[in-house]
A protein has these predicted regions:
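Acidic, proline/glycine-rich low-complexity IDRs
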Residues: 1-71, 75-194
Length: 194
């Protein structure tokens, strides 16, 4: 199969405009992961580029299929000027490399934890993976390859992550919705969970 990354970058540019910054990270034993930054008014979006180069594989499979399997990139949207969110580049690259490093299949409803604040003084150490298809449409690839999904990431506080483990992703998203939580606020506090 042809290299999908130029198609992925074109889809990101079509949906989000021209990136105003990009950084690349390479971890030992993994392909290069780039993080592109797109600014739109008071919102800045960070999108990974490189996670979808290979399909995610079931870690229990004897051989990984080089064509079939889910493919994804990650997109994080936050308000500008509230916190130094550009430091999220490395944690995002770590999350994007997790399918190659840990054999993890990243899918909606999953929690991804980096163990440290996503950026300096951030109240968030993990993210909830949301459904694709909203901000950036899925990218169809030639059969038999699965489409590339652009999965939004919703930052979670440690308390929200613990609550999500007990009650589920949908319950946490409903809690955020009923409380009117601004999920793009990089300095927001945990939603009331009682």
């Amino acid at each position: 199969m042809a290299d999908v990354l130029p198609l992925v970058e074109a889809r990101l540019r079509t949906a989000l405009g021209e990136p105003d910054a990009r950084a690349a990270v390479t971890f030992l034993g993994t392909d290069r992961i780039e993080v592109l930054r797109f600014t739109d008014g008071d919102v800045v979006r960070y999108a990974t580029l490189g996670m979808s180069a290979q399909p995610m594989a079931d870690p229990t499979a004897v051989l990984a299929d080089p064509v079939k399997g889910p493919r994804a990139e990650l997109v994080l949207s936050v308000r500008r000027g509230v916190a130094d969110t550009d430091k999220v580049l490395r944690p995002l690259a770590v999350l994007a490399a997790s399918p190659q490093v840990e054999g993890l299949i990243v899918a909606p409803g999953a929690s991804l934890d980096v163990g440290d604040p996503l950026w300096p003084e951030a109240p968030f150490t993990s993210v909830l993976v949301a459904e694709s298809g909203g901000l950036v449409e899925d990218l169809e690839l030639d059969a038999p390859a699965d489409p590339v999904r652009f999965l939004p990431l919703l930052p979670m506080t440690p308390n929200e992550a613990a609550w999500k483990r007990v009650h589920g992703a949908q319950a946490l998203q409903e809690r955020w919705l009923t409380q009117g939580t601004d999920l793009r606020d990089p300095a927001r506090t945990s939603v009331p969970l009682d």
